Regions:
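Long, low-complexity intrinsically disordered regions
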Residues: 1-286
Length: 286
């Protein structure tokens, strides 16, 4: 059985994750270039999910600091200041964690979402079929009718202001973000902390996104995203793809098989330190 070359794998990840000091990001413009280069990255590292993150590319391969004055937290300002600039797509997407997506790649994600063209109707179908909670429906309809709102006002409009509604409201926002129905588009001085995200309907903030996505088939979208993922991490097991993207195992397997058939990946590989079948870029195989 062919074996992964760990030295080459580690070298690739050091490059794509920007862990070396000389490769670190030092400006918002470099951060945008980094996201465009990788296609999609996490804001902060996510335990159990291997993917480049803005934090690591700025602060190095270390845990996110608790101290607010840590130099690595410059990333927070970069994120907030970019939300209304349309330089990338940002929201709680992959595994419902904070994710940056390049504008070129966003249509591939959108093509896999449950959005089919009518922003005033899709959510109703999803609700009637049990794929959208009542809280998510209320939040979405508040934004649909009133326009961009900060989270404090949004809770009031959605009638989810009670303390017992905290988790319900937060889950609704996460679900709507993960399905590309809403996204944060700015911040506002609101609430006790004088800080709150502003949200809007995705298709209203990026009106060209649905049309671009309409030309992309689901299988094509999955292949593109899986190829970018492998380009960032070099080698994966089937479960890694399934967990990151939330795809059914059979679709993940079919997607990887197509990349193998096209010569972009090798399959049936062994890892010197981890059992199971691995898929990897061809240049990482001995």
């Amino acid at each position: 059985m062919p074996t992964l070359n760990l030295e080459r794998l580690q070298a690739l990840r050091a490059r794509t994750f920007r862990v070396l000091p000389k490769a670190r990001l030092t400006s918002p413009a470099q951060a945008v270039d980094f996201v465009n280069e990788r296609g999609f990255v996490f804001f902060w590292p996510v335990k159990g999910l291997l993917l480049p993150s803005l934090w690591t590319a700025v602060a190095g391969d270390r845990p996110v600091a608790d101290e607010h004055d840590d130099p690595g937290h410059v990333t927070w300002g970069w994120k907030d200041n970019s939300l209304d600039k349309r330089v990338w797509y940002y929201g709680k997407i992959l595994h419902r964690k904070a994710t940056f997506i390049s504008l070129e790649i966003a249509p591939y994600f959108y093509a896999l979402s449950e959005n089919y063209g009518d922003i005033a109707e899709d959510h109703l179908v999803a609700y009637e079929e049990g794929r959208l909670t009542l809280a998510a429906k209320l939040v979405y309809e508040a934004l649909l009718s009133k326009g961009k709102m900060n989270t404090i006002d949004l809770r009031k409009e959605a009638h989810l202001t009670s303390k017992s509604s905290d988790s319900e409201f937060n889950r609704a926002l996460e679900h709507l973000q993960a399905d590309f129905k809403v996204l944060p588009v700015g911040t506002a001085e609101a609430g006790a902390w004088k800080y709150a995200y502003q949200f809007d309907i995705t298709a209203r903030h990026f009106p060209e996104l649905p049309e671009k996505a309409r030309r992309i088939g689901e299988a094509e979208a999955r292949r593109k995203l899986a190829e970018l993922y492998l380009g960032s991490v070099g080698a994966v097991q089937l479960r890694d793809v399934t967990r990151l993207f939330g795809w059914p195992p059979e679709l993940s397997k079919r997607t990887l098989a197509h990349l193998v058939e096209s010569g972009k990946l090798c399959a049936g590989l062994s890892h010197p330190q981890t059992a199971g079948e691995w898929f990897a870029l061809t240049e990482l195989v001995d």
